[in-house]
Amino acid sequence: MSQWKNICKIDDILPATGVCALLGNEQVAIFRPYHSDQVFAISNIDPFFESSVLSRGLIAEHQGELWVASPLKKQRFRLSDGLCMEDEQFSVKHYEARVKDLSLIHI
């Protein structure tokens, strides 16, 4: 990515949770699955219901992959690329995310 944007501090996200942030006009769900500085970012919009809810979903691990389950009907989206586990015809946009200088999350 050519232009990284500061989003929030890593400490703004409790481990095993997500938050929603605005990146331009897009809602981005940012997840911190563990106590480490590993973060993932996908669209916050559930494509099945067109609702802004994915940041409030439950994070789970299945067969070595991290997923978030939508709080609505529990469809799971892979955090590494946004693919829907239940129906591969659906996916959400994935964003590159990193932690810079041990504190700031960049997308």
Question: Where does each model-flagged region fall?
Answer:
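N-terminal first-folded block
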Residues: 8-38
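A structural signal for short hydrophobic beta-strand segments in well-ordered beta-sheet cores
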Residues: 21, 30, 59-60, 77, ...
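Immediate flanking context of iron-sulfur cluster ligation sites
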Residues: 32-41, 56-68
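C-terminal structural segments of small proteins and small subunits
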Residues: 83-90, 94-96
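Conserved small/polar residues in nucleotide/adenosyl-binding loops
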Residues: 105-107
